[in-house]
């Protein structure tokens, strides 16, 4: 969602798309994550704070696992309908970071069954909302330096 730390995959790729930079992906892009829209995550936290039991743990997740290559291709597809690119932006596979986790996934059944919380925003909706937010708030990403957004790339 909006204002995620700029070095993370989605804001980094959006920044690069807007600036016609190549899209660097670690390894073969197979590292997968469970994606959840920020508003859904905040609503889950509120549910835990107001309805959860003290001392209990509640994993917050969407059950939507996608790898980095799938997420990047999704952003490229969205960009084709939203902005005019100055040149063809390419996906560029770079050396993976040492110790880079291959998969993050949660079992969020407990929060769903005990607190009746479910994400409202599917991945496709959330990624479009995020792209649109960055497109409408260009001053935000322009205030970030390129160094802040791509500082870890290539430092395997």
Language-model features and meaning:
Residues 11-156:
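C-terminal substrate-binding subdomain of Rossmann-fold SDR/epimerase-dehydratase oxidoreductases
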Residues 1-8, 31-32:
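Flexible, glycine-rich beta-alpha linker
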